[in-house]
Amino acid sequence: MNHELTNIPSIRHNHPTFWRDLANGTYLKLAPRIAVHRDHYHGLSLSSQLRLRAIAAARSAYTAVLISKSAARVHGLWVLDSTEEKVEMALPHNSLPNKHRRHPERVYRKTKLPDPLLVHGARTVSPARAVIDIARFHGFREGLVAADSALLTGITKKKLRQEFARMGRIRNSAVVREVIHHSCATSPSPYASFARALLIQADFPWPMFYEVIYTALPGITAELCINKTYIIDIAEPDDKHTAGSSSTAIGPATTIEPPGEVTATTIPTKPRDQVDHSRDKRLRDAGFTVIRISPHQLVQHPERFISEVIATISARQNAVRAQRSRL
């Protein structure tokens, strides 16, 4: 990681190209003392850019420590990407920097810090502490995403609870406890974790049971299943043919489509479309209901996802009641 960043104070004043490149934008100044080559930076994914910015900010600071989402990124934990995300830092001694020293792309939080770790030259809190910070600063949904990924790396719920206990009395402690309680070590993706968080928070009129990595049929595994009946399919970001669309298949012949949306089965057939169609048909024939949503739609319109789940379950129950009444 360190070779990607240039420590500006280490460059001699008579360097033949660096200072000119820094002035003309060939090198980007990510932090007061850290620069990165423009082509390298723009070639990274948003997630990698945010991680690099966090490391640059910490390496450019004298005492500040990365916390919350920024710490999670440095440790490789799941964090949902946002172009509006700022680097999150804290100062020792539970203090805040003077206003004239604050950077517009950073957020300083007043919090007690443990002894920091050093990762890629950046001072940061531990992965367990990062999870707790995300839960208390950003809420249950993003906290559960981070907690699930922490458990995947081998951090236990016991370790999370111990770290939480060491912090003493803090705000939003109830949210932290809920995140730890509901976290699991088998979530297949941050989007599956986010969807599960939405389902946990939703006020459903029926009992709801969730299973992660559910084997619905031989050779067909779902990221998330509700009540052993409703399969939640979350298209990955590179599945362009389903991005921005959602469909809910009810029974062998009926498809419920949200207004204005295009379902995967109406798009011109591609090899992946054929696989999805065959998979959905097998699931429907076996009595499952498939709810498909893109990651973008899930994160940008969470209330729509919950509304679709409620509408889907209601429609299925109404169809079953109508069928029974005809018998």
Q: Which role does the model predict for each range below?
A:
Residues 1-172, 208, 314, 318-327:
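Short gly/ser-rich loop at a beta-strand->alpha-helix junction or flexible surface loop bordering the NTP-binding
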